[in-house]
């Protein structure tokens, strides 16, 4: 879980556009966020296995 202070800091408008970054909407993790779903890889995997993300299925080959 991300610190509440870091989440609040990220929500404030940044002075420069390059300082903005994505954060997982579920847990607040700043790294490996899938932009389309706004989730980190860990939360995405959990929700995909539960079938809570429409259109996502487990790959097999």
Curated annotation (Swiss-Prot):
Molecular function GO labels: rRNA binding; structural constituent of ribosome; zinc ion binding
UniProt: Zn(2+) binding residues: 24, 27, 40, 43
PROSITE patterns the record matches: RIBOSOMAL_S14
GO annotations of cellular component type: small ribosomal subunit
Pfam families, per the entry: Ribosomal_S14 (PF00253)
UniProt function note: Binds 16S rRNA, required for the assembly of 30S particles and may also be responsible for determining the conformation of the 16S rRNA at the A site.
Similarity-based family: Belongs to the universal ribosomal protein uS14 family. Zinc-binding uS14 subfamily.
Matches recorded under PANTHER family: 30S RIBOSOMAL PROTEIN S14, SMALL RIBOSOMAL SUBUNIT PROTEIN US14B
Subunit structure: Part of the 30S ribosomal subunit. Contacts proteins S3 and S10.
Protein name: Small ribosomal subunit protein uS14B
UniProt lineage: Bacteria, Bacillati, Bacillota, Bacilli, Bacillales
């Amino acid at each position: 879980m991300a610190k509440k202070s870091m989440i609040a800091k990220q929500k404030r408008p940044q002075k420069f556009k390059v300082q903005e970054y994505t954060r997982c909407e579920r847990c607040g993790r700043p790294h490996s966020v899938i932009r389309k779903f706004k989730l980190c890889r860990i939360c995405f995997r959990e929700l995909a296995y539960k079938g809570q993300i429409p259109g996502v299925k487990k790959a097999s080959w």
